Curated annotation (Swiss-Prot):
Any one Gene Ontology molecular-function term assigned to this protein's record: tRNA binding
Region Disordered: start-end pairs: 1-20
A Pfam family per the record: Ribosomal_L16
Protein name per UniProt: Large ribosomal subunit protein uL16
InterPro entries: Ribosomal_uL16 (IPR047873), Ribosomal_uL16_bact-type (IPR000114), Ribosomal_uL16_CS (IPR020798), Ribosomal_uL16_dom (IPR016180), Ribosomal_uL16_sf (IPR036920)
GO BP term, pick one: translation
Length: 141
């Protein structure tokens, strides 16, 4: 699972997920990728399950880049616990996703096969996404 090696503070506040993503919005490594078109939150398990689905479909040909990293701790209190007594423990690591953010990139394989693999990965993600290529990259969200 993806998570930071160490952080300055164990727990963070929730914050707000607003606006569009300008950093990490363009293809930098591959020829085709998945771009988020709505706000959401992705955790390390979702990132990993989508990656596994893609790599199994392409039979380890080509290369896959993960463009997101879950660096925000999400806390939860145990079930049937009364209110109070402090904030719960860290349950999982997440990353807030804004529209326009690239999630995965691929290179070195046929575009039709890459589209099939990325469609499998899209079904594992908890927000709406679209497949972009280097030609369609300049389209707005």
């Amino acid at each position: 699972m993806l998570m930071p090696k160490r952080t300055k503070y164990r727990k963070q506040m929730k914050g707000r997920n607003r606006g569009k993503s300008f950093r990490g919005a363009n293809l930098a490594f591959g020829d085709i990728g998945i771009k988020a078109i709505e706000h959401g939150r992705i955790d390390s398990r979702q990132i990993e399950s989508a990656r596994i689905a893609m790599t199994r479909h392409i039979k380890r040909a080509g290369k896959v880049w993960i463009r997101v990293f879950p660096d925000k701790p999400l806390t939860a209190k145990p079930l049937e616990t009364r209110m109070g007594k402090g904030k719960g423990g860290v349950e999982k690591w997440v990353m807030n996703i804004k529209p326009g953010r690239l999630i995965y990139e691929m290179a070195g394989i046929d575009e039709a096969l890459a589209r099939e693999a990325l469609a499998l990965a899209q079904s594992k993600l908890p927000f709406k996404t679209k497949i972009i290529t280097s030609e369609s990259e300049n389209e707005i969200y």
